[in-house]
Amino acid sequence: MIQMQTILNVADNSGAKKVMCIKVLGGTHHMIAHLGDVIVVSIKSSIPKGKVKKGEVCKALIIRTKCGVTRSDGSNIKFDSNDVVLLNKQGEPFGTRIFGSVPRELRVKKFSKIVSLAEEVL
């Protein structure tokens, strides 16, 4: 469960390392984001010569959460950290690689480009 002011790790090679959630998109009463939701983030730390700089505001897709998600077969999948992938204005990822594994629930939510860039799909 991701809410405003949550610090998240970035799981792609866009140049950002840490981001902070400043808005959860999806309506007026949508206050908590889960796996596969799009949020607005502010870049808190980045590497030099990256595609994004510290202080920039952009959208991000949540690909891993500590809270986890329950699948239809009853299994539960959790991760060790809260991670996102940065998106541009068209909804495509900034980076060309995604580090770590992503759940297959992202394919159902129409993010097949991100699933194809990932190292492993759970």
From Swiss-Prot:
Top-level taxon of origin: Bacteria
Q: What SMART domains does its record include?
A: Ribosomal_L14
**RNA-binding as a keyword?**
yes
**Which keywords has UniProt assigned to this entry?**
Ribonucleoprotein, Ribosomal protein, RNA-binding, rRNA-binding
Give any single GO term for biological process: translation
Role: Binds to 23S rRNA. Forms part of two intersubunit bridges in the 70S ribosome.
Which protein, by its recorded name, is this?
Answer: Large ribosomal subunit protein uL14
| Organism phylogeny | Bacteria, Pseudomonadati, Pseudomonadota, Alphaproteobacteria, Rickettsiales
